[in-house]
């Protein structure tokens, strides 16, 4: 898992430079709207909405934006209707990719995702052929300068976390989905701020790539998928071979 995590760290640094706050708010807002539409606007009785709000707060989304997104979902405000899409994909070198999206028009989003895949050596897969290679986990990323690893392990495991991964400048805290909210609360109570926090797919087994050209194609593909306006998350089982790590620092 370490190689995959190192790639995730490389990509996270790039995203910190390239991402725009407005785009992040739009994505999270869609997730809140869908959650409110499916389970109602009360976060106390809608766990999914509660988690979406926690995610919004973790990226400092203004309270007004959050409330507006909820009202759109409950029908109190007029707006477009969103639906969720999950795309199972294969990429260059046979890697597996899971793409989650929220869209107001699936008939537009699906061909666009397919086009990105085709242009960069990927393809859509049949349902179940890729998802079986992943499992859902709570993932919380925070800067390591905030706390020592030993202290974080005590706090996170005490809150129900399964694992704490030290990636140098960041820690990655992993939990089962049912414990995600409890772990996040424990970290917040400690005064720790997360850079990312969500329930997402993570690979059961990584696929190591040692060919530089293939690795470059994979990275470009993941970046383009992640950059699509409707995409909320992209996860792959791509692991960069240690022999190539310096090439992408």
UniProtKB/Swiss-Prot annotation:
One GO MF term attached to the UniProt entry: DNA binding
Q: Which Pfam families match?
A: TACO1_YebC_N, Transcrip_reg
Which GO terms of type biological process are on file? Answer: regulation of DNA-templated transcription
Keyword DNA-binding (UniProt): yes
GO cellular component annotations of the record: cytosol
Keyword DNA-binding recorded: yes
Keywords (alphabetical) are: Cytoplasm, DNA-binding, Transcription, Transcription regulation
InterPro entries reported in the protein's UniProt record: Integrase-like_N, TACO1_YebC-like_2nd/3rd_dom, TACO1_YebC_N, Transcrip_reg_TACO1-like, Transcrip_reg_TACO1-like_dom3, YebC-like
Q: Where in the cell is it found?
A: Cytoplasm
Q: Where is this protein chiefly located?
A: cytoplasm
Query: Which family does the similarity line name?
Result: Belongs to the TACO1 family.
Q: What is this protein called?
A: Probable transcriptional regulatory protein LA_0720
Source taxonomy? Bacteria, Pseudomonadati, Spirochaetota, Spirochaetia, Leptospirales
